Amino acid sequence: MTFIDQLNAAWQKNNSLLCVGLDPDPAKFPAHLKGRDDKIFEFCAAIVDATADLVCSFKPQIAYFAARRAEDQLEALIAHIHEKHPGIPVILDAKRGDIGSTAEQYAVEAFERFKADAVTVNPYMGRDSVDPYLAYPDKGVILLCRTSNPGGSDLQFLDVGGEKLYERVARLASGEWNSSGQISLVVGATFPAEIARVREIVGDVPLLVPGIGAQGGDIEATVRAGRTANGTGLMINSSRAILYAGKDERFAAAARQVALETRDAINLYR
């Protein structure tokens, strides 16, 4: 089953557009986990198990694992999701951006080592930086387009032949680069007008939307701007607001409650 097939099935099965981001910061873990060697895996797996029926995808951020020499725990986490919660796609948030043999190795890392179902990619270097990932026909490739950070406007709003750079990325990603139908785009919840513009350009191409929760993006504006005609088309990511909802041994239950509330808030506007 391809990433897009999994995503479509998860949207329907779980009645959810929520993506839970897995950005584990041990400094914020409950005290009972802090001394354990595999605390990053244990924390993330508990969050996953508590929320898997409420989400359309999970998105581990590779830097949070690599910075603590915990890549083996990331491998174990993705394997855990695939084994215990089959059908929920895993997006490796790596934002790689290179070309040629280096990009090929990054694709091997994402899809063969970590066995992610999709990966985020920086398309700044053009099609050469995307093609190595598209060589895996069952995998998803999610390109940065209009990012949620304020500084994104420094480049993404530059005029390129009568359109903004982020619009050009959207046009390429939904057109000539996407003959295999594997590409999705990152568009930040902090900019709902741009979400609507990207949706206008790309049709039903899925959008990964960070920026709700701790970053302050508005759920109603996001959903109304980005939903497709059938009320799907979005992976609306929340990380910190869910991960760190609880401070004690019941942290996973607290995370579930916030995830449930977030999913239901999203569904109000579908």
UniProtKB/Swiss-Prot annotation:
Q: Name one GO biological process term.
A: 'de novo' UMP biosynthetic process
Similarity-based family: Belongs to the OMP decarboxylase family. Type 2 subfamily.
Q: What is its EC number?
A: 4.1.1.23
Keyword presence, Cell wall biogenesis/degradation: no
Query: What lineage is this protein's organism placed in?
Result: Bacteria, Pseudomonadati, Pseudomonadota, Betaproteobacteria, Rhodocyclales
* Family annotation (SMART domains): OMPdecase
One Pfam family from the record: OMPdecase
Q: Which cysteines are joined by disulfide bonds?
A: none
Supply the name of the protein. Answer: Orotidine 5'-phosphate decarboxylase
Note the NCBIfam families from the entry. Answer: pyrF_sub2
- What keywords would UniProt list here? Decarboxylase, Lyase, Pyrimidine biosynthesis
* Residues at the active site: 95
* Enzymatic reactions: orotidine 5'-phosphate + H(+) = UMP + CO2
Q: In which pathway does it act?
A: Pyrimidine metabolism; UMP biosynthesis via de novo pathway; UMP from orotate: step 2/2
Gene Ontology MF, one: orotidine-5'-phosphate decarboxylase activity
Superkingdom as given in the UniProt entry: Bacteria
